[in-house]
Amino acid sequence: MTYLIAFAIIFLLAVVVIQIGKLSELSARIRGEEAEERSVNNTQGMALVAFMVVFLIACVWSAWAYKDQMLGYGPLTSASAHGFELDHIFNVTLFFTGIVFIITHILLFWYSYKYRKVNNTDKAMFFAHDTKLEMIWTVVPAVVMTYLVANGLIAWNNIFPTLGPDSKHIEIEATGYQFAWDIRYPGADGKLGNKDFRLIDPANNSLGVDWKDEASVDDIILGGSDKIVLPKDSTIKVRITAKDVLHNFYLPHFRVKMDAVPGLPTSFIFTPVKTTKEFREQLSKFPEWQVPADPADPTGPKKWETFEYELACAELCGKGHYSMRRIVEVVEREEFDTWLASQKPFYVTNIRGKEYDPWAGKKLFPFEIKARANELKSDIANYLSDTTGTASRNIQLKHVFYATGSADLNSDLSKYELDHLVELMAKYPSLKVELAGHTDNVGDAASNQVLSNSRAGNVLSYLLSKGVNSGRLSAKGYGQDQPLESNDSAEGRQANRRTELRIISK
């Protein structure tokens, strides 16, 4: 129905225009062609001058009235170090193009009036060549363009400095795809691992990260809805790429904008200089940000209180283009370090211990050893300090490994957790524990009982060899009788093959 009404309106307007044209022709015949033409020319000339005045005033007024809603003006000053320089370049460019804009429009409409046809003897002036005029419109734009380009090159070099291995910067990676961004942070080593598109597995490795590269195993990957967190006053280098179509990595408040092209990695370097909290306080000083964020809830939070930095895709990439918006939060460096330390590496949560883990049974990484040591220390301390009886006395030794199908202890990998257990036993001299061995239900129950006994005994022998008093230790195998998970799946059977620390007395 809406389309039908719109079509009818357009049709009626066309009829009106045609009828006005016919009336003009009829009027010209009655009044005389020359007089009518002179009248029309005068009317149009004056109308064009009036339009020029109204148009230029409207342009200047609207620019001034809405300046606080444009990037670079009012409260929307740059939130990055380089952004101030870019805003200055835009202002300089606006100054020169504004002069051309105003002069061009004044001449355009004034000449339309001045050189309107008044008499049949009037003729347009024509000249084929004017050296002075050609020099002016060649040299002046060339000088202005040279100045603008030179300033742009200087700014470009300032924005993209050479970052060496000793540069104290944070390198992250943004991968665009329909319709989200995956953001990868380096772990404790400060390095992003390698990627290879041939390793992409939509179910388990959507970025194609090479897990054989040790720099990859502590990398942190944020999914499509996780908040992106950045530190204030720290240099950030963003690797930008895409998996499917052309995207664009756009952080408007930081003056960051770079295409994300499949197969062609790009990058951008910037330094945030205002936290999200500081930018909100800046916005709060302007009346247009003091209105309710939700007009339907006048008593709710103000607009400035709900402000968030954002990452957008500035390339029309498909019907879900709008959903690529991500929240960006800038915090102080200490808060960022705390947040980053709380994030678990993708490898640990999604790859470690699976059949496609290239390091299974081969290596423990420093961040794993440290995290497990803290976890074991916390578990024991929580039980010893518990007065409610809710803390579990059973603590799984997650980094104790054996040869497949054997009771032989893999000392190279198990030593880290067991040595830390020795330290905790020394810290708590009254602590007595039982080492409990468990298996899955593969094979017969009697063999599993023997295997679990032997494995628990080998752990006990290791602890004794490190000087732990034998009176504080005991070992027992429980075979397949106490499963944690169902033995119907490989993951369940793996969870049931374990060694536990059972606290007997505090």
Model segments located where?
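Periplasmic OmpA-like peptidoglycan-binding domain that tethers envelope proteins to the cell wall
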Residues: T404-Y416, A426, K432-K506
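Non-transmembrane, membrane-proximal soluble domains of secreted or membrane proteins
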Residues: E33-V40, I57-L94, G98-V100, H105-F367
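Sec/Tat-exported extracytoplasmic proteins
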Residues: I240, C317-G320, L340, V422-M425, ...
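Stable alpha-helical elements in mature extracytoplasmic
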Residues: K132, E305, Y309, S414-E417, ...
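Conserved hydrophobic/aromatic pocket- or pore-lining residues that grip, position, or stack substrates
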Residues: P141, A174, V238, Y402, ...
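Periplasmic peptidoglycan-binding/tethering modules of Gram-negative envelope proteins
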Residues: G353-K432, K506
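Transmembrane alpha-helices
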Residues: M1-D68
